[in-house]
Design a protein with these regions (language model features):
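N-terminal secretory signal peptides that target proteins for export/translocation
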Residues: 1-8
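Flexible, small-residue-rich N-terminal segments that precede or flank a structured functional core
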Residues: 28-83, 119, 204-207, 217-226, ...
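Alpha-helical segments with a strong preference for the paired helices of cellulosomal dockerin domains
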Residues: 241-262, 269-287
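Extended, low-complexity, turn-rich repeat/linker tracts enriched in Gly/Pro/Ser/Thr and Asp/Glu
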Residues: 98-107, 206-208
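Bacterial N-terminal signal peptides
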Residues: 11-23
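Ser/Thr/Pro-rich, low-complexity mucin-like regions
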Residues: 178-221, 230-233
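A short beta-strand element within beta-rich, extracytoplasmic domains
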Residues: 79, 89-101, 227
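Beta-strand-rich interaction/scaffold domains
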Residues: 102-187
Length: 287
C-alpha cells in the first residue's frame, strides 16, 4: 500500500493547489500508435529439425493438435519506439492484435517481456507448421539461425506475464494498460538496447489451443500488431511539471496533488510520488 502523506503534506497540497488553480496545467500528454517492426513464431519441433515463420502472414501461440505433433507455438513481437522522444515519461500502454483463426474456445494469451535479442528472416509458409529457416530467422532453438542459440529453447523471457487477455472467437483483442506494460515500454525507451519486445504465450497445457494472429506482413494494415502509447515529454529540468520553463509553487501544487500515486510527478521514476520527488523539485527551484 502506498504511504499516506502527513497532515502537513495534505494541508500544503490543498493550499498549493488552490493558489495554483488559476494558472496551473499539467504537461500535455501525447499519443503514439506504433505497428510491430518484427514478429515471428517460435515453433517447437518434434523431429529434431528447425522450423521458422519469419515473413509469414500470421503468428501463433498455444499448443497445436495431434496432427501437428501436439507441439507449442509462441509469437514474438517487437516495436520501434524511436517516434517517442527520449526522456519521455510513459503513462499508459495497450497492445492490440487481430486473432484470425482458432479451433478452441477462450484461452489466456499472456505477454512476457523478452530478455534476449532475436531475428526475423525471410522464411515463409502458410499455416503454423513453418518451413526451413533462413539466415537470421528465430526458431525454437536459435535466436539467430544458424549462428546463435537461445540460452533456453523456446526463447528467454521474464517468467511473470506483463499482461494477460482471454482470447475466444475471431476478432480484435486489446491487452489494456497495466503497470507492467508501462514499465516494459519505459525501460525500452530509456535503454533501447534492451528492447527485445514481448513473447505471446498461450495455453500450453492443452491440445488444440493454438490461436492464429495476423502479423505485420498481413495485407490488411489494420490487423497488424499495434501498441498505443500515451506519454509526456521530458521537462527542461526535473520539476517543471507544467512545462512553463519555471519550477515554482504551481509545480509543487501539481506534485503534492499527486502524492502517493504515479505519473509525471514521479520525478525519480521509483513508482511513487513522495518526499524524494519533492526534494528533487525543490533542488531545481526556479521561480
Amino acid at each position: 500500500m502506498a504511504p499516506r502523506p502527513s497532515r502537513h503534506h495534505v494541508g500544503l497540497a490543498a493550499l498549493a493547489v488552490a493558489c495554483a488553480a488559476p494558472c496551473a496545467s499539467t504537461a500535455v500528454a501525447d499519443t503514439a500508435v506504433l505497428r510491430s517492426v518484427a514478429d515471428v513464431t517460435l515453433i517447437q519441433p518434434n523431429d529434431g529439425l528447425q522450423y521458422a515463420l519469419g515473413a509469414a502472414y500470421n503468428i501463433y501461440c498455444g499448443r497445436v493438435g495431434v496432427n501437428g505433433g501436439g507441439t507449442l507455438r509462441r509469437a514474438v513481437v517487437r516495436f520501434d519506439l524511436s517516434a517517442i522522444p527520449a526522456g519521455s515519461t510513459i503513462l499508459s500502454v495497450s497492445y492490440k492484435a487481430y486473432m484470425s483463426q482458432t479451433n478452441s474456445g477462450a484461452n489466456d494469451c499472456k505477454l512476457h517481456r523478452m530478455l534476449a535479442p532475436w531475428g526475423e528472416g525471410t522464411s515463409f509458409a502458410f499455416g503454423g507448421g513453418g518451413t526451413s529457416p533462413e539466415v537470421n530467422d528465430a526458431t525454437w532453438t536459435y535466436n539467430f539461425w544458424p549462428t546463435s542459440t537461445w540460452a533456453v529453447p523456446g526463447g528467454v523471457f521474464v517468467p511473470t506475464a506483463s499482461a494477460t487477455k482471454s482470447v475466444n472467437a475471431v476478432g480484435f483483442y486489446t491487452w489494456a494498460t497495466v503497470p507492467a506494460l508501462v514499465a516494459d515500454v519505459q525501460a525500452w525507451l530509456d535503454t533501447p538496447a534492451v528492447n527485445y519486445g514481448w513473447v505471446m504465450v498461450g495455453n500450453e497445457a492443452t491440445l488444440e489451443t493454438a490461436k492464429r494472429f495476423d502479423a505485420r506482413e498481413s495485407s490488411d494494415i489494420t490487423h497488424h500488431p499495434t501498441i498505443t502509447v500515451v506519454y509526456t515529454l521530458a521537462s527542461a529540468a526535473p520539476g517543471d511539471l507544467n512545462g512553463d520553463g519555471k519550477i515554482n509553487g504551481v509545480d509543487m501544487g501539481i506534485l503534492l496533488a499527486a502524492w502517493g500515486g504515479t505519473g509525471p510527478a514521479d520525478l525519480n521514476r521509483d513508482g511513487i510520488v513522495d518526499g524524494a520527488d519533492l526534494g528533487l523539485l525543490l533542488s531545481n527551484w526556479k521561480p
